[in-house]
Amino acid sequence: MISFTNLSRYTDIGSNCYLLDMDGVRIVLDSGMHPKKDGAEATPEFNLIGAADPDTIFITHSHLDHIGTLPVLQDKYPAAEVNMTAATCEVGLAMLHNSVNVMTAKRTQEGIIDYPFYTHMELDHVARCWMPRPYG
């Protein structure tokens, strides 16, 4: 049996995240952060993943609406394998570190207490688990 679940909180572009279940193999596709929302409202609805943990996470590319909450997802499901291209690993890490800076500034300037979702140290820790895959 195959099921496809949209974990995105909204129907517009942003917080892209999907669960593909194929005969019990559970794959999360992307883990984005919505660019026009703040705090928890910017995240996918990870609670829809359900009781069974995902087996793997696949990131399509390094735009924040596809990778922005990956460290949050990894924290919830540390055993899930994380796959992406080598270029996505490199650019994604830089994008996510910049995101920490932006979230930290928003917490200070706008009082958004949910931010930051993760720290630079936490990001570096989870990034060690990323598995770069050849493109093509």
Give names to the regions the model predicted.
Residues 1-4, 26:
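Extreme N-terminal starter segment of soluble prokaryotic enzymes
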Residues 4, 82, 129-130:
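Generic structural signal for residues in well-ordered beta-strands
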